[in-house]
Amino acid sequence: MGAIKRTPADKAFSDCIRSAAEWSCERCHTYYPEGGRMGLHCSHYHGRGKWGIRFCVENAESLCYGCHQYLGAHPYLHTDHKMNIHGQAAMDILREKANDTSLGRMAKREVKFIAKHYREEFKRIHQLRLDGVIGKIEINSWS
């Protein structure tokens, strides 16, 4: 099985997730300055193959390479980590969305719109940072 193709929507979504977290790992809080951001990933709890939640803000977070690898290798800890952030009810909804194939078909049809939406969100977040806003910024999800 080949790697999952990274679309322009994936790039825009990743930029939003990482910039909203101030270019820092949301687990260990390591900051990644401009020019050194390759080690900071947009981590998906349910993998990108689940198109229904591929671009769902609650399914993603900014993690450094080390934390991403560690949580990926320890799924029970990853679940606990996400549960502490979102709670049981939100995790149940996320799982239902992950398994909803109609959501996946819709996302595939609207991938260009999704890319545009997250490019605009990235610009909004960038402007908020220029205006002096600090801390995690809420991302307006496409769905």
What are these regions (language model features)?
Residues 29-33, 60-87:
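Short Cys/His-centered divalent metal-binding micro-motifs
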Residues 26-61, 71:
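Histidine-centered nuclease catalytic patch
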Residues 46-59, 83-98:
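Short microdomains enriched in Cys/His and/or Lys/Arg
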